[in-house]
């Protein structure tokens, strides 16, 4: 959640081909839960850029003018490929799903300081080496929505690293069972109960669960929205 200030504008996650610190790149998805009027995200360049142009914009403070400003909508998902310069603007609350990687390069931080007058560490040279300088276009996903009597399932994002779906439940929903890899569940609205064989667990907003790759089905009951991610 970031309602008072923008988050680390200019964060860059490494692309796969240029991984250099024994880490994978970090593709991710932002699912907007709520936002203030006029809020949005920065994502990718408006047009093809060169390293020299970006470096000059960082020096003279005009870097924001090179980036796409995208007004957000509640309930919409935004896919951010690794290597894309990006940041969440203030007043935006998202559920963030990321490819597993600990590497982030901070390119710009609004010249902010902490209470001791210190600025956060930047990683400009590393970011310049791995960022995608091409013009960014927001990926468009084909709408895949299944409507049942007691729930609605909508695919939010699908890539080679993960698949995310929103389950809006008003009663009962049987969730997919996977045997090839684990999955995760995050409750972003409401509350309910999960059932797996003889086990049950109550949940509410903010709770998250890892589901092992046992192939055993899980049933969710309640009035809620769950984000299911399969790796």
Where are these regions (language model features)?
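Glycine- and acidic-residue-biased ligand/ion/polar-headgroup-sensing regions
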Residues: 25-50, 54, 169-197
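Ligand-binding loop in jelly-roll beta-barrel domains
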Residues: 14, 23-25, 35-38, 84-103, ...
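Short acidic-glycine-tyrosine-enriched beta hairpin
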Residues: 67-79, 197-215
């Amino acid at each position: 959640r970031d309602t008072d200030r923008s988050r680390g504008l200019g964060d860059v996650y490494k692309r796969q081909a240029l991984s250099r610190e024994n880490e994978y790149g970090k593709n991710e998805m932002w699912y907007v839960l709520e936002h203030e009027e006029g809020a949005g995200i920065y994502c990718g360049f408006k047009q093809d850029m060169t390293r020299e142009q970006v470096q000059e914009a960082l020096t003279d403070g005009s870097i924001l003018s090179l980036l796409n400003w995208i007004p957000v909508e509640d309930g919409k998902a935004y896919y951010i490929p690794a290597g894309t310069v990006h940041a969440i603007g203030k007043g935006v609350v998202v559920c963030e799903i990321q490819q597993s990687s600990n590497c982030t390069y901070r390119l710009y931080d609004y010249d902010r300081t902490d209470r001791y007058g210190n600025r956060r560490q930047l990683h400009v040279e590393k970011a310049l080496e791995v960022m995608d300088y091409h013009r960014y276009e927001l990926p468009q996903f084909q709408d895949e929505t299944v409507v049942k009597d007691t729930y609605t399932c909508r695919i939010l994002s699908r890539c080679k690293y993960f698949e995310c779906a929103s389950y809006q439940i008003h009663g009962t929903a049987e969730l997919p069972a996977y045997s090839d890899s684990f999955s995760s569940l995050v409750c972003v609205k409401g509350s309910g109960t999960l059932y797996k064989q003889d086990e049950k667990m109550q949940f509410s907003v903010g709770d998250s669960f890892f589901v092992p790759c046992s192939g055993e089905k899980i049933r969710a009951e309640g009035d809620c929205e769950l984000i299911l991610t399969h790796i």
